[in-house]
Amino acid sequence: TVALQRAQMTRAILLRMIRMAELRDPKETGPHVNRVAGYSVEIYERWAKNNKLERKEIDRTRDNLRMAAMLHDVGKVAISDMILKKPGRFTDEEYGIMKSHTWQGARLFINKQSEFDELAQQVAISHHENWDGTGYPGHVDIESGKPLKTGPNGEPLGRKGEEIPLFGRIVSIADVYDALVSQRVYKDAWTEDDALEEMRKMAGTKFDPELIEVFFQVLPNIRTISDKYKSDL
């Protein structure tokens, strides 16, 4: 059918977008985005069941969330190689540019035509927000990155609590956990015990405490996904 062909074409384009991000940023590997997507779906499914959502809605959202989570860092295609591939610490200016990957990614979905576009935009812009309002980019205009609300220092005011879209809060947990337990050029992988202790510690500050409880409920599934998509490092 035409609808099926269109869906397959959309999926193919999205997979190419994911590949583009991977070519630009050495950290955005295939295994990493697959793990983040897998963890996100597990957290969402358990949260949805806990909250008695209908199976039909869960299935539809799950498929959209998987692709949106894979594209969480797609805005990095707008960041220069000098910053993306810098081995040392960022200067304040470089960090400011790096943070723009959130709204730059959200801009790709600005003419929202589907539930997927809405979800992908939410994930791109909000996966670095913190539950306590200390994350980024905060309340900014998606087109320009300019602040819509500013804090006392003139910086954009961070989104906090349930101002952060649910799917951004979920992908944040998946992304941070994967970063902790993964080896990178500049750091060794943490042990699972240390990473889990850190995740628990950040409930209520970095993360939504309810979703951290859900994360621990699905830990066996998280381990299975982690084993399935091992990194080459």
Residues covered by each model-derived region:
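Amphipathic coiled-coil signal-transmission "stalk" helices
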Residues: 2-13
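Metal-dependent catalytic cores of enzymes that make or break cyclic nucleotides
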Residues: 19-233
